UniProtKB/Swiss-Prot annotation:
This is UPF0213 protein CPE1444. Belongs to the UPF0213 family. Residues 1-75 form the GIY-YIG domain. PANTHER family: UPF0213 PROTEIN YHBQ. InterPro entries: GIY-YIG_endonuc, GIY-YIG_endonuc_sf, UPF0213_domain. CDD domains: GIY-YIG_UPF0213. It holds the Pfam family GIY-YIG. It comes from Clostridium perfringens (strain 13 / Type A).
Amino acid sequence: MNYVYILKCKDESLYTGWTNNLEKRIKAHNNGCGAKYTRGRGPVKLVYFEFFENKREAQSREYYIKKLTRNQKLQLISSKSIKEENYEKEINL
């Protein structure tokens, strides 16, 4: 499974990425081993994700989302919000 995800950083900025292991990747971001952008901006919080069968689709979607404005990303997040109590169970955080 491949995932595209959006994180909200401690400074309220948004980070978009893709991975094939969402649980491991979020832990890496929170441990300072993720993307340079999220280092020093943690802890991060998962606010949105989608899953895809193949890497190419996930990377294409990530590219699309990264080009959105902040307001468009916030609309995307609110249209498919994650219930906090459920997403932690879904990805074992």
